[in-house]
Structure formats: C-alpha cells, structure tokens
Amino acid sequence: MRYFLQLQVVNMPEQELEFRGINRKHLGMYFEELGGKQITDDFPYIYKSNEWCGEIVREEELSITSTFKVNSVYIRFNASDDMTLKELIKNYRVKTRRIGG
C-alpha cells in the first residue's frame, strides 16, 4: 500500500542546488541534523521543519571519465522567508563541506 502526501508551498522562497559525490542518505541525515523530520520514503524525499522544507528531488550518475563516475543529487530548499532560506542553505553547506588533505 502506498500513501501519497501532497505538500502545498505557497509563496515561499526557494532555491535548488546540486551536490556531487555525497551519499544521498547522508544528505537526508543533514536535514534531520538541522531539525527537519523526514516526511516521505521515496523521491522526492521531503524533510520538513516549522520554518523550512527540503526536498531531495533526484539522483543521477555522472561519468567524469569512462571509469570514474560520481553521483549528482539535486536538492530544493524552501523556507518561510528569505533570511531563513539563506540560513538553512548556509548551515546545510557547512555539513556538505569536504576538506581534502
């Protein structure tokens, strides 16, 4: 049995970003660490808090070379206002930052 959830987002600021090379499950976990609750169990994976909504829209595989492939995950951020959206994206980017050594 499948349940369908319809979320209505009205006049909320929105931005979509692409993240490469990060596991989709980790990207969902970052929303939870920022206070979101997982609403759906399939694409689009939706995470919601009182002031924002994050969606893992889709995942693709990119071929950099014939042997080197990397995942690409598209995430949509919605928030109650511009300031909340900027803060959410800033905090999310901190979690996705990778420092090489």
Identify the role of each PLM range:
Residues 63-101:
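C-terminal basic regulatory modules in eukaryotic proteins
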Residues 4, 8-20, 24-65:
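Ser/Thr-rich, low-complexity intrinsically disordered terminal regions
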